[in-house]
C-alpha cells in the first residue's frame, strides 16, 4: 500500500511537468484528491492486534503511522485548493514548481511515516527541509521571509547532526537499524549517565521539529511569512514529525529507565505550554497567535509522550491528528481574512460576522475545537494527556490547569476579536465568501467528525 501511495505521488509530479497549462490545477487537485481518498484504506485495512502491517524490508505501517500517513495525503489537495487563488496568477513555471513541491513534501512524509529503517527515516525526515524552505522564501509575502527561512534551516540542521550520531551509535550497538529488530534485540551496556546523554542527543531534532517551548523561535517566523499552503502543511503535518519521532525513540529506549530525564523534560514541557498560552493572550497578529498555540499544544504532546504511558501516547497521537486539522483550518481561515483586508492585525480585522456570516460559523467551530469543547477529538486527546500527566505527578496539576485555562481564553479571543465589534473602514467593501473557502473548511471538519464517530481509528491499541 505504501509503495502504491509513493508511486501515486510520483505520477502526479510527472503529470504536472507535461500537462497543458489550462488543465494544470484541475489535474493536480483531482489526482491528489484520489491520493487522499485512497490513503484511509491504510487505517481500515490495518490489523490493530498486530504492531506492523503491509510489512516489507523497508516500508510498513502500524497504528501510529497509518493515521499520520492518511493525514499527509488528505492535506495535499486541500493545500493546493487553498493556494489556487493566489498562485494561479503567477507564471506557468512558478505554478508547476509550487505544485511539484507540495506533492514532493507529501511523498517525503509518506516515506518518513512508513520507514522501517531508521536511516531511511532520517533521510526522509531531512528531505522535507529544502522544499519547505523554498515555499517560505519563494512564496512568502514579505522580505522577512528570508530571515524566517534562515531560522528554519539553522534550527533544523542544528538538531540533525546529534540525531545522525545517535543512529550510528545504535547501529554499532545493535548491528541493525530496522525498528522492529532494534526494539527486540537492543540491550545497551553503557552506563546510565552515558544513556541519558545518548537519549538527550537523540531527541533534540524532534524537540526542534515539534517544537516545544525553548526550541520554538523559528516557528512563528516561518508561519507568519509562509504562504497559506506552507502554513497548512507545516502546522498539520511537519510539526507531527517531531511527535512521531519521539514515540518511535521512546519505544527503542523502552528497556532503559530514563526517569531522571523524564522528570526534567515533562516539567519543562508543561511549563512551556503554560508560558506559550500566556504569550498567545498578548498576541496582536492572527497568524502569530495560531503559531504560538501550536507551540503550546505540541509542548503538551511532548510531555505526554515522555510520560511513557499508554494513555499519554494515545492522547498525544489523537491530539496531534485533531489539532493538525484544526490549526490547518485556522490558518486557511486567517488567509481568507488576509486576502480581503491585507492585514493580520486583530485590532483591524474585527466585525467580520456582519460581512461574512457563514465564515463566522467556521471560525466558531474551529475555535471551539481548538479549546477542546465536546464532542471534538481534541477533548479526548486532552483528557487522556491530562490524566496521564496528573497520574505521573499530582504537582503538575496547577501548571496544566492554568495552561488549559489560558488556552480557552486565547481560543475564545481568536473568535471574539476577529468576528465581534464594528468593522473598520478598510474591510467594509470586501468580497463575500467563495465556495472554495467553505469547501476547505468542510474538508478540515469532515475527518474530525469521523474521529468523533470512530475514535478507535486514532488509537494505538497494541501498546502495552
Curated annotation (Swiss-Prot):
From the UniProt record, report the name of the gene that encodes this protein: ND4
The chemistry this enzyme catalyses reads: a ubiquinone + NADH + 5 H(+)(in) = a ubiquinol + NAD(+) + 4 H(+)(out)
UniProt keywords (A-Z) are:
Electron transport, Membrane, Mitochondrion, NAD, Respiratory chain, Translocase, Transmembrane, Transmembrane helix, Transport, Ubiquinone
Kindly give the PANTHER family that the UniProt entry links to this protein. Answer: NADH-UBIQUINONE OXIDOREDUCTASE CHAIN 4
Q: Top EC class per UniProt? A: translocase
GO BP terms, alphabetized: ATP synthesis coupled electron transport; electron transport coupled proton transport
**What topology does the record note for this protein and the membrane?**
Multi-pass membrane protein
The regions listed as transmembrane in this protein's record are 1-21, 63-83, 98-118, 119-139, 152-172, 197-217, 227-247, 261-281, 288-308, 314-334, 355-375, 389-409, 443-463
Protein name per the record: NADH-ubiquinone oxidoreductase chain 4
> What family is this protein classified in?
Belongs to the complex I subunit 4 family.
- Sum up the protein's function in the record's words: Core subunit of the mitochondrial membrane respiratory chain NADH dehydrogenase (Complex I) that is believed to belong to the minimal assembly required for catalysis. Complex I functions in the transfer of electrons from NADH to the respiratory chain. The immediate electron acceptor for the enzyme is believed to be ubiquinone.
Q: GO terms for molecular function, please?
A: NADH dehydrogenase (ubiquinone) activity; ubiquinone binding
A GO cellular-component term linked to this record:
mitochondrial membrane
What is the annotated localization of this protein? Mitochondrion membrane
Query: Where is it predominantly found?
Result: mitochondrion
What EC number(s) does the entry state?
Answer: 7.1.1.2
Presence of the UniProt keyword Mitochondrion in the record: yes
Q: Does the keyword Transferase apply?
A: no
